Amino acid sequence: MSVVVYAPASIGNVSVGFDVLGAAVSPIDGTLLGDRVKVEAGAEAFTLKTAGRFVDKLPANPQENIVYDCWQVFARELEKKSVVLKPLTMTLEKNMPIGSGLGSSACSIVAALDALNQFHASPLDETELLALMGEMEGKISGSIHYDNVAPCYLGGVQLMLEELGIISQSVPSFDDWYWVMAYPGIKVSTAEARAILPAQYRRQDIVAHGRYLAGFIHACHTQQPELAAKMIKDVIAEPYREKLLPGFAKARNYAASAGALATGISGSGPTLFSVCKEQAVAERVARWLEQNYVQNEEGFVHICRLDKQGSKVTGSEL
């Protein structure tokens, strides 16, 4: 018996919702932009194998891999429920670049915990599993946050609530939007991108942030795409972080001139996203980004749609 789970890339913040908004995306051409984890019966308590395009970026010691940490916390939770942990082998297929702003760590965490849960006939419910995912994300970045793991696991656009036992809830989205994702091939550490932000903000920025975020959520619920796109503005992080992203301002200006509805930094960068209404515009923007924003052979551009499903079982073999 074995199970394979795929977990998609995600856009943390979606510009307008710093630390409280996230969206899962998948390429329209069927490319798997995300990690896969296989769990199968093993001879020992835990064995980890690694594969995939970015396997050389993973720690050599399996016990330094986040998937090992996922197995440990999953074992801790099963013990609380008096459920027997099966001896198993996990294989992480690392298809996502690390430090890319695409929720790379979230992909590994979500795929690992979802696969472990499925392999054990789902002893943990959705909220319990999501809480573990946030805990693991916190282990990597230093603070528990759900804006990548929630959309990666649950799909679509997720708003973090963390009240009344609710971690996040989905926000109505615009299914005809294209999301152009461009990763330049360089690394930006989340810690560095957080350190660059000010400790305090001006009142006018706080007011603007509240207006944009409230306006975006309102426009999503009332299905006003033009208004929603206008509200995708970031006064919290982008003004400070764009200096970490060579060519971002130029790319944003080009995308706007080409007809994109909005452009922003995905997570803490360096990946950017550009929202387009027409596929022709998305293709034009993607071509320009391939030629002008991508810096090396590790970089890539994908035209995506929102991934409404989130993580999913893709069979029993990688």
Swiss-Prot record:
The keyword Cytoplasm applies. It is found in: Cytoplasm. GO terms for molecular function: ATP binding; homoserine kinase activity. Pathway: Amino-acid biosynthesis; L-threonine biosynthesis; L-threonine from L-aspartate: step 4/5. Gene3D superfamilies: 3.30.230.10, GHMP kinase, C-terminal domain. Its main location: cytoplasm. It catalyses: L-homoserine + ATP = O-phospho-L-homoserine + ADP + H(+). This is Homoserine kinase. The lineage of its organism: Bacteria, Pseudomonadati, Pseudomonadota, Gammaproteobacteria, Vibrionales. The gene is thrB.
